[in-house]
């Protein structure tokens, strides 16, 4: 019990550093599905992260960063986890949304991670939390795997990798191979000869397979949500506008289910955006 108390104290200090450096902390949009004995989805809930999960995340990030620093300093051939700044057109769209919500845009053309993190904190636990957090997340570039340490924008870290996680990933195993050879005393020359081409291929393959897995997960999630909502066709729900396009509004319910309200369905109503 005392060990957990000490770990919690360390977690609080890490979380404070996390906030101070401008790392982003999004409120989760992840859904939790309720299945009956036949495997049919009968309900959808918003998944909530508990304190234990947040503690694990902070320690995991620290371990991943520490290993990435070691690899960069030793000039090892490596697989880094990188994340670039958002594209300008996405930043412009986010700015327009903030203005329409009555918020001051807290950044210039190229927002820093710290500025976006402050925006997330400013709207946390407010009526605008969901729409702002959702759209800041959509503004972000996709993280990927690379053999060069170009930094992680979202975590506001110069060095990052995927060394450990609650579920083992291929990039974890790839760098375990490299680190195993390194700690056994292999020379930098032999490591470069053995792994230089490997880290290039592993980075490309891991990024591609991650995207394929995310697409599959998104499709399955959509199917479960549609299955759960099918008995409720025709009912009214309260939702939050999570996106605006020329063809309509995206509306998200409290349980994370999102749907499109087409503009032609609003033609009889006075609506100003």
Regions found by a protein language model. Name each.
Residues 1-273:
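Electropositive polyanion-binding surfaces
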């Amino acid at each position: 019990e005392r060990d957990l108390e000490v770990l919690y104290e360390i977690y609080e200090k890490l979380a404070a550093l996390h906030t101070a450096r401008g790392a982003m902390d999004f409120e989760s949009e992840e859904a939790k599905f309720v299945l009956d004995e036949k495997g049919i989805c009968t309900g959808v809930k918003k998944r909530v992260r508990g304190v234990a999960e947040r503690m694990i995340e902070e320690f995991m990030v620290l371990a991943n960063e520490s290993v990435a620093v070691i690899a960069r300093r030793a000039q090892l051939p490596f697989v880094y986890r990188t994340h670039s700044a958002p594209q300008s057109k996405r930043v412009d769209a986010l700015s327009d949304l903030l203005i329409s919500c009555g918020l001051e845009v807290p950044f210039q053309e190229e927002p820093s991670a710290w500025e976006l993190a402050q925006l997330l904190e400013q709207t946390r636990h407010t009526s605008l939390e969901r729409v702002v957090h959702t759209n800041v997340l959509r503004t972000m570039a996709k993280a990927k795997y690379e053999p060069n340490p170009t930094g992680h924008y979202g975590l506001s870290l110069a060095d990052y990798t995927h060394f450990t996680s609650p579920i083992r990933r291929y990039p974890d195993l790839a760098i375990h191979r490299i680190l195993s050879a390194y700690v056994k005393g292999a020379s930098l020359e032999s490591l470069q000869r053995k792994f230089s081409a490997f880290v290039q291929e592993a980075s490309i393959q891991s990024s591609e397979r991650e995207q394929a897995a995310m697409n599959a997960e998104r499709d399955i999630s959509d199917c479960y949500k549609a299955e759960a909502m099918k008995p409720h066709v025709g009912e009214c729900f309260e939702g939050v506008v999570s996106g605006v396009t020329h063809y309509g509004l995206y509306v998200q319910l409290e349980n994370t289910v999102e749907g499109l309200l087409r503009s032609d369905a609003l033609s009889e109503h006075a609506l100003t955006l």
